[in-house]
């Protein structure tokens, strides 16, 4: 039951700090046990926001969260998060690779929590067809549907931009000019050498050539760079013009 893991995917900087399983809708005793367990984790990990999936027992879990926050004296907020496709992700090969130590319920909880942090970064991991937007989408030929939905996802990713120091391979491979291989190489380089401190440093990534850099640079953000334009949609080729303005 996915409701047993609701709100438990407390994530900070893309890392899972703690997990537990509670049963807040199985009676008053179980609800109070859930409040005690979650309150302990909230204090331990300095949690400030709770993500509650909008699926089974969402309202009952919300009521428990309100009671818990009141007992804590405030300082914590919650939000109802659309969990469409979370169960599909939790049973996927990608989820198993990311969280081999967790069962599908805990993977779903992490996915729901991360959607509150960065919705786009999490939703790109899910087949767009599983999100269920549009009741007649499956009347289209599957190949054409995949191409259309994939194009929309990539357009969204490029329009928003991607933080190269936090993005997963699933998100990076949606950036124009990058492939699955170069996306994985970016993450591997980041893990081995530390965060990127400039867009120029992206050229050091193995198998990411000048053409690929030219295509992807404007969509990759580097917040830690001393060059302020590295954290904007301005392409390096236009830095001189932007600086003059």
Stretches with model-predicted labels:
Residues 30-45, 49, 56-160:
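Conserved phosphate-handling catalytic cores of large alpha/beta enzymes
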Residues 20, 25-31, 159-245:
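Accessory alpha-helical DNA-binding modules that contact the DNA backbone or grooves
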Residues 1-8, 12:
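Single conserved hydrophobic/aromatic residue that forms the stacking wall/gate
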Residues 6, 62-65, 198-201:
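Short beta-alpha junctions and helix-cap segments that line functional grooves
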Residues 13-24, 42-46, 92:
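Gly-rich Lys/Arg/Thr-decorated short loops/hinges at beta-loop-alpha junctions or inter-strand turns
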Residues 10, 21-22, 62-66:
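Short amphipathic alpha-helical segments
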Residues 9-10, 16-18, 49-53, 77-80, ...:
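Structured core elements
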Residues 3, 40-42, 203:
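Structural motif
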């Amino acid at each position: 039951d996915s409701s047993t893991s609701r709100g438990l995917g407390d994530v900070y900087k893309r890392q899972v700090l703690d997990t537990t399983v509670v049963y807040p809708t199985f009676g008053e005793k179980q609800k109070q046990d859930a409040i005690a367990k979650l309150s302990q984790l909230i204090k331990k990990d300095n949690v400030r926001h709770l993500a509650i999936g909008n699926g089974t027992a969402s309202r009952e879990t919300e009521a428990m969260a309100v009671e818990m926050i009141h007992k804590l004296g405030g300082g914590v907020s919650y939000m109802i998060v659309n969990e469409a496709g979370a169960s599909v992700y939790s049973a996927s090969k990608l989820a198993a690779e990311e969280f081999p130590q967790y069962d599908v319920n805990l993977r779903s909880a992490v996915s729901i929590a991360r959607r509150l942090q960065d919705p786009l970064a999490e939703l790109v991991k899910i087949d767009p067809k599983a999100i269920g937007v549009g009741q007649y989408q499956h009347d289209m030929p599957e190949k054409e549907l995949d191409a259309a939905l994939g194009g929309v996802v990539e357009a969204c990713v490029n329009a928003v931009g991607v933080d190269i120091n936090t993005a997963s391979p699933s998100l990076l491979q949606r950036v124009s000019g990058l492939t699955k291989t170069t996306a994985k190489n970016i993450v591997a380089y980041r893990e081995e050498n530390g965060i990127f401190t400039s867009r120029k440093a992206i050229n050091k990534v193995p198998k990411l050539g000048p053409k690929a850099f030219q295509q992807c640079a404007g969509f990759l953000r580097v917040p830690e760079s001393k060059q302020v334009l590295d954290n904007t949609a301005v392409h390096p080729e236009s830095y001189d013009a932007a600086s003059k303005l």
